[in-house]
């Protein structure tokens, strides 16, 4: 059976800590979408690990880790991540169906961002998915055969010829790209496998599989705040499509949310706080992107969006992250509905334009940092947790009270 860990905000919810905390109980940890535009930060024994492509289970020697078919892979960045760990042989596997991000994709991404102003990381994620959908992409499996790779590269060079100048690729692009693969393909080849068959077999044997997503539900290409979204499907349903596991294989769906809310880049954010309180949340919560180091926009918990995300994913339980960031705040707001042109909205709309938050205010608490038992939390903190659980209609299964792995309350 497989369990899914999915972000239910705009990403950066703390999925990495939860996966790291529970990964020891699983045989496989699988990253099922996105690219190196996303980042997980894990603190283990006082050491901070920033992962962009590798699944969070790499810190457990007995855990097998898979990068599945719907992930887009920068081979250079993956090789650099691999070099930071020892003994990944037979512990890390990259799907032969996963698509390869080319330097051209990053150039195209930056070019398009100048006019679209979506707020992308400019790492080539979107353009790589574009080539995938156009059936012209290079897959990881193509790197296993030099002849096939050369054929794919020649087709790529022909296709981009009209755009080389616009994207600033330079006269030596073909030579440089061949050199790029010559340098990195041999390093990555030992990890490329038919992961779909591996996971189907593992599921049939009854092995435990943990599927981890990147970004968050509200960035889903179809169901998020379009056009300010990522280029992949980020919900729990996409875990099946990417891995080859059928929907019957899914058991638990753990939705990850912060006790407040953040967003990186442009796009609507009804509960954003642009006062000094937003700055306080950013500073205390260390809200700066793992990948880009960009400051995150900060605000209050949005229950309209949270209920929508829980419904989309079929969440069976929630993980409430960074409760400690709210320590010491006298009045804590929660967005319980929107107002748009005089109308109260309690359902999440397809367009958030003109949506203003309607808040309910709670009394704060002094300290929750490092607490590991629910009964040790102050009454106001427990009331806040109970309110979220009641309004969303999904039980809270665990609460994080610091970046440390062990500072977690299990309910």
Curated annotation (Swiss-Prot):
Q: Keyword Ligase on this protein? A: yes
Task: Say yes or no: keyword Magnesium present.
Answer: yes
Subunit structure, interactors included: Homodimer.
Put simply, this protein is called: Adenylosuccinate synthetase
Q: Which residues bind Mg(2+)?
A: 12, 39
Lineage per the UniProt record: Bacteria, Pseudomonadati, Campylobacterota, Epsilonproteobacteria, Campylobacterales
Give the binding site residues for IMP. Answer: 12-15, 37-40, 121, 135, 215, 230, 294
The entry's keywords: Cytoplasm, GTP-binding, Ligase, Magnesium, Metal-binding, Nucleotide-binding, Purine biosynthesis
Task: Read off the CDD domains from this record.
Answer: AdSS
């Amino acid at each position: 059976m497989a369990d899914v860990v999915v972000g239910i905000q705009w990403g950066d919810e703390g999925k990495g800590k939860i996966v790291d905390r529970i990964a020891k109980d699983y045989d496989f940890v699988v990253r099922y979408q996105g690219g190196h535009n996303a980042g997980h930060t894990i603190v283990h024994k006082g050491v901070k690990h920033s992962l962009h492509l590798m699944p969070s289970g790499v810190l457990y020697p007995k855990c097998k880790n898979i990068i599945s078919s719907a992930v887009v892979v920068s081979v250079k960045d993956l090789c650099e991540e691999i070099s930071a760990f020892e003994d990944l042989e037979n512990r890390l596997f990259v799907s032969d169906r996963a698509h390869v991000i080319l330097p051209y994709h990053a150039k195209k991404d930056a070019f398009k961002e100048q006019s679209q102003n979506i707020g992308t990381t400019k790492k080539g994620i979107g353009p790589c998915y574009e080539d995938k959908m156009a059936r012209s992409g290079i897959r990881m499996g193509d790197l296993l055969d030099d002849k096939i790779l050369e054929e794919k590269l020649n087709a790529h060079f022909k296709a981009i010829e009209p755009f080389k100048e616009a994207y600033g690729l330079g006269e030596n692009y073909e030579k440089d790209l061949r050199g790029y693969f010559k340098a990195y393909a041999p390093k990555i080849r030992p990890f490329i496998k038919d992961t779909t068959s591996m996971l189907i077999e593992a599921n049939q044997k009854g092995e435990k599989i943990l599927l981890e997503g990147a970004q968050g539900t509200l960035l889903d290409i179809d169901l998020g705040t379009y056009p300010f979204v990522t280029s992949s499907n980020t919900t729990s349903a996409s875990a099946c499509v990417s891995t080859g596991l059928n929907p019957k294989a899914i058991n638990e769906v753990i939705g990850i949310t912060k006790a407040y809310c953040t967003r990186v880049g442009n796009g609507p954010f009804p509960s954003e706080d642009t006062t000094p309180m937003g700055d306080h949340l950013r500073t205390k919560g260390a809200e700066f992107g793992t990948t880009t180091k960009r400051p995150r926009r900060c605000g209050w918990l949005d229950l309209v969006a949270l209920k929508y995300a829980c419904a989309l994913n079929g969440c069976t339980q929630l993980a409430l992250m960074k409760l400690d960031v709210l320590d010491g705040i006298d009045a804590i707001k929660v967005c319980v509905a929107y107002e748009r042109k005089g109308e109260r909205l309690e359902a999440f709309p397809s367009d958030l334009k003109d949506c203003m938050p309607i808040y309910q205010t709670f009394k704060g608490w002094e300290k929750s940092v490092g607490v590991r038992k629910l009964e040790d939390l102050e009454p106001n903190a427990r009331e806040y947790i109970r309110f979220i659980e009641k309004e969303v209609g999904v039980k809270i299964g665990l609460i994080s009270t610091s970046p440390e792995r062990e500072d977690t309350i299990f309910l």
